[in-house]
A protein has these predicted regions:
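ASCE RecA-like P-loop NTPase motor cores
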Residues: 1-301
């Protein structure tokens, strides 16, 4: 789709300016042009993008970006915090591990990352790698060892799999419902060889079709964090571009989060965040004129020194 748009000299200059560790401020940016420039960075420069924001998913920006790039933009979610305590939602934990795994594989991604998620520690790459299981048809997998390995990953053995985080064993079949998946999977074994993998409906238990492979992530993030933690941005490739989607909203969000997150052990300071981000190219976007931006921009830049 982008091939249909002529690239002006000013946009060409913008793309050339975006080198390693560069820093650009774009004021009075509407959602459409912002999405268009982001898509150009992704397609023309072949660089992954992290969209850092202080608000919930900005549908105008993200919807336009999905149209320009012809891909779904996924959100890296944060834990839910209620009464100054984290809630451990299996869907959120599963999605966090899934995205981290893709980033570690150097996949060129566009990820939407709320400020709260950016300030939360993640499991170190080494710990995550040790706790991911992969399954593929026509591969060897020790049947007995697999059954023994599932409870330490947080999976509960039941007679019938109906919810995420459960597994069941019947003869040479193992049913597993990964915490990041919309459907559970049924593995059929012949000895220690996986001969077939099928998705199935947890209500009817009927098969929904064959799949060639799938990954299984842990359900317990907290215990893994105690074994080794790092920041989200350590998973990114050096050529990643970090786009600050509306500086004013990011500053407002941090003012709201600061008191709550500072008391929790698995979140770090915004000062540490901005120090980490110095190794990436950064684009600061705002809908306001540069005159109104100056106070917010100066305040945020102060955290980088």
């Amino acid at each position: 789709m982008l091939n249909d748009f002529p690239i002006s000299p000013s946009i060409s200059h913008f793309l050339r300016t975006l080198g390693d560790n560069s820093e650009i401020v774009l004021d009075k940016m509407l959602e459409g042009p912002k999405a268009f420039l982001s898509a150009l960075i992704y397609h023309k420069l072949n660089r992954p993008i992290i969209i850092l924001t202080g608000v919930e998913r900005s549908h105008g920006f993200i919807d336009n970006l999905e149209t320009f790039t012809n891909r779904k933009i996924e959100e890296f979610p944060a834990w839910e915090i209620v009464d100054d305590s984290p809630l451990f939602n299996p869907d959120i934990i599963g999605k966090r591990f899934e995205i981290l795994s893709r980033l570690k594989a150097n996949s060129k991604e566009i990820i939407f990352c709320p400020l709260q998620a950016a300030l939360q520690y993640v499991v170190s790459p080494e710990i995550l790698k040790q706790n991911i299981l992969s399954f593929a048809v026509n591969t060897e997998c020790d049947f007995t060892k697999l059954i023994a390995s599932l409870p330490p990953l947080g999976y509960t053995k039941v007679s019938l799999v109906v919810e995420k985080g459960q597994f069941a064993v019947r003869g040479g079949l193992i049913d597993i419902f990964p915490n990041h998946s919309l459907t559970p999977y049924r593995l059929e074994f012949f000895g220690d060889e996986i001969t077939e993998i099928r998705a199935f409906d947890p209500e009817s238990q009927q098969s929904q079709g064959q799949v060639s492979h799938f990954y299984l992530f842990p359900t317990d993030e907290l215990s893994l964090l105690k074994g080794g933690k790092t920041d989200f941005f350590s998973y990114l490739s050096p050529d990643t571009v970090v786009i600050f989607d509306d500086l004013l909203s990011i500053e407002d969000k941090y003012s709201t989060l600061h008191k709550t997150l500072s008391s929790l052990p698995f979140f770090f300071s915004v000062e540490s965040l901005f120090t980490t981000l110095k190794k990436f190219s950064r684009i600061y976007c705002t809908t306001s004129p540069i005159e109104k931006l100056s106070v917010s921009y100066t305040h945020l830049r102060a955290h980088e020194t």
